[in-house]
Amino acid sequence: MQMDNDFIKKLGYRALDNRLKRISDRMSHDTRKFFKQIDIDVEPSWHLVFKLLGEYKTLTMVEIAQQLGYTHPSMVVMLKKMTTKGYIVSEQDSIDKRKQNLRLTQKSIDLLPDLELIWHSCEDAIFKMLNEDLSILDRLDEIEESLKSIPFNERFYNEYQKQKI
């Protein structure tokens, strides 16, 4: 029996989440390979933290999570790895002792010019991969806004209830 080589693609919109994850995983994997190739010990997902702390200098974990729309647990893992690698430091807030302020280390600050060049090259590669057509971003914005207004689990549950009738 001949099998279709791309089951996810064959399913179309019914596997949208899997397809988006596959694209994301592929880009992250390839970016990780690129960083190894140029001997820079950075994870692809860290670039947004570098950019935020480069711009704002000091932020709390909660502020970073809010800016990126990430969950607190995923931020804890990411920021711990960045701290372990010596890219960020955590300092107790002088006013609110419960808060930990995060900032880039000198190692990160020294690396920023190289990272800026890398990010610009990555942006150019993405732009060209999209054939200079950024309309996909508008569609992604619509999907994200739609999910904010009615979470997917509610949509899913409503459709499930209709099917049961």
Predicted regions and their residues:
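Charged, amphipathic alpha-helical coiled-coil/dimerization segments
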Residues: 80-138
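N-terminal helix-turn-helix DNA-binding core of bacterial DNA-binding proteins
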Residues: 29-71
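N-terminal positioning helix adjacent to the helix-turn-helix/winged-helix DNA-binding module
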Residues: 12, 16, 45-46, 107
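Alpha-helical linker/hinge and terminal dimerization helices associated
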Residues: 27-34, 68, 111-130, 143-150, ...
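N-terminal leader segment of winged-helix/HTH proteins
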Residues: 1-39
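Alpha-helix boundary/capping and short turn/kink residues
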Residues: 25, 39-40, 58, 116, ...
